[in-house]
């Protein structure tokens, strides 16, 4: 034997003392559930896989074809990309809106994305608006005139809404995956359909290029900025988006400039203590968000290193002064 610690006695034990049991499950959602329940000694299923299994079970029988399509679309996605959508954005925003801690997304948090089954739930008043939206979107898209005009009506998802179980869950995740991909990283600077001011472009270009941007703490701060921007866009769209970029830049990166080091707790505390996400949730116009007062920094406040490019932006925007 090439490995002396694995000898003939071990082989004999495997051949004569061990058994292999095979389970065959024809339902994919049952397979996910069974695997997770039997896998306590191995690697857990990802939270988004558990959510997939849960929401597949929530499909009504008459949507079998749509269920198969949802499975196909989901499985065409890269698992790490789905994990990023949930862990970095959807989970954190939904928690911060309610002033709750949002460190790491785990299987213990999947209840956050379980909502109401419109085909089974009691007709409580709170479900009525969801039923109207759900049925109206389907009625519009299934009308014979759509064959002529080729129009479609997307469901009006909101980041902080009650989740509609089943098909709408999969549509919601696809919607936000596309939105995240269009608003984060370098994507927004290339969106010709979203005109931005020179200042907003300058900010985004700086965030995408300053030398220290790949440090762990700087990544956390970029996540703060991106989450605030995503939540704002989800509610107000392009309206005063350039001003929002300026506001969220100062709000997020003040935390970076005034900290020697940024940890996940630093990011989380800043998001919750500032109440920005709660402000966006309650606002009925962009003006209320943009009126958020922010501190002007001085040299005594600066603790971070290698941030000269961003300090210059703060100074140009009158949020940094050499002396008061």
PLM regions: where:
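Flexible coil/loop and intrinsically disordered segments
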Residues: 1-324
């Amino acid at each position: 034997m090439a490995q002396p610690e694995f000898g003939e006695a071990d082989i004999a034990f495997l051949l004569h003392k061990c058994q292999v049991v095979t389970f065959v499950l024809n339902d994919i959602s049952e397979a996910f559930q069974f695997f997770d329940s039997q896998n306590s000694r191995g690697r857990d299923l990802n939270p988004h896989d558990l959510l997939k299994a849960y929401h597949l079970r929530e499909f009504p029988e008459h949507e079998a074809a749509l269920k198969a399509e949802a499975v196909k679309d989901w499985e065409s996605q890269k698992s790490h990309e789905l994990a990023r959508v949930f862990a970095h954005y959807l989970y954190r925003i939904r928690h911060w809106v309610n002033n709750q801690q949002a460190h790491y997304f785990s299987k213990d948090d999947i209840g956050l994305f379980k909502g109401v089954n419109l085909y089974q739930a009691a007709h409580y008043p709170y479900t009525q608006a969801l039923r109207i939206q759900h049925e109206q979107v389907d009625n519009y898209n299934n009308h014979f005139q759509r064959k002529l005009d080729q129009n479609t009506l997307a469901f009006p998802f909101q980041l902080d809404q009650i989740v509609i179980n089943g098909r709408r869950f999969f549509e919601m995740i696809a919607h936000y995956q596309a939105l995240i991909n269009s608003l984060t990283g370098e994507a927004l600077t290339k969106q010709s359909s979203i005109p931005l001011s020179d200042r907003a472009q300058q900010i985004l270009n700086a965030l995408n290029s300053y030398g220290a941007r790949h440090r762990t703490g700087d990544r956390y701060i970029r996540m703060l900025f991106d989450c605030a921007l995503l939540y704002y866009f989800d509610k107000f769209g392009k309206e005063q988006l350039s001003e929002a970029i300026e506001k969220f830049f100062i709000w997020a990166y003040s935390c970076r400039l005034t900290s020697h080091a940024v940890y996940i707790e630093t990011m989380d505390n800043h998001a919750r203590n500032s109440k920005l996400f709660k402000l966006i949730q309650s606002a009925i116009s962009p003006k209320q968000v943009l009126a958020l007062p922010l501190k002007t920094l001085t040299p005594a406040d600066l603790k971070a290193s290698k941030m000269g490019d961003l300090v210059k932006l703060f100074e140009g925007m009158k949020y940094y002064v050499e002396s008061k």
